[in-house]
Structures are given as C-alpha cells and as structure tokens.
Amino acid sequence: MNKQINIRKIQEKIKKIREKKIKFLRYDWDKFYRIGRQETWRKPKGIDNPVRLELKGYQPKVKIGFRSPREIRGLHPSGLIPFYVNNKKDLEKASQMKDKVIVVFSSTIGLKKKLELVEEAKKMGLKIANG
C-alpha cells in the first residue's frame, strides 16, 4: 500500500513538471522553412541575436535551471525505471526488480525474438512499455 502511494506521488510530480516543461526551439525556426524542419535547440551566436542577449519578449535561452529534478529524471511517466532488454538473460535480471522497473525492448530486436520475450515477460508478471 505504501509503495502505491509513493508511486502515485511520483506520477503526480512528473505530470506537473512535464506540463510546465518548456520546448526550446531554435531562434527564427518559424520564419524559414528549412530551419522550421530543425526544431532542435541551437545556441545563438549572432552579435545582435536577442535570444543570446536574453531580451524580454523572446524565447528563453537554455540554462541549467530548467533541468528536471533528480528524483524524476529519466523515469517513465508511470514512475518506474525503464529497463532495456535485449535477451532472456536481461529479462531475468528485470524480474528480480519487478516492483521498480518497466521493461523496454530494444529497437534492434527482430519481431520473432520480441514476441518470444513479450510472452516470457508476461509469464514473469513484468510491466511492458513497448510490447
């Protein structure tokens, strides 16, 4: 019972923080088609760039203060730790920590092997993120 309350608190905290999370876009991403395709952050380096100068009314510049809290960093939205699996040996390791982890199958696994691992994980009672 206590574990569920703890996980629920973590889930609520994750939800609140991810709602507030700012999406850092490249300066002028909306003005040019080729830049608009690159919606990833690039450090502004121009001499008069308002983002670099951190002028009011422009998008925020990436800073260390925007980082998510350590206790929720890297967690799955369910509040569990993602555990990447490539083979049955990894599944056995995950089953030892099944209260804390959620299984994520590696993208390099083929369909046949993935189906076998999904079946095995269900027998072990593991939670699966992408099965």
UniProtKB/Swiss-Prot annotation:
The keyword rRNA processing does not apply. GO terms for cellular component: cytosolic large ribosomal subunit. PROSITE patterns: RIBOSOMAL_L32E (PS00580). GO terms for biological process: translation. Coiled coil: none annotated. It comes from the Archaea. Pfam families: Ribosomal_L32e (PF01655). GO terms for molecular function: structural constituent of ribosome. Keywords: Ribonucleoprotein, Ribosomal protein. Belongs to the eukaryotic ribosomal protein eL32 family. This is Large ribosomal subunit protein eL32.
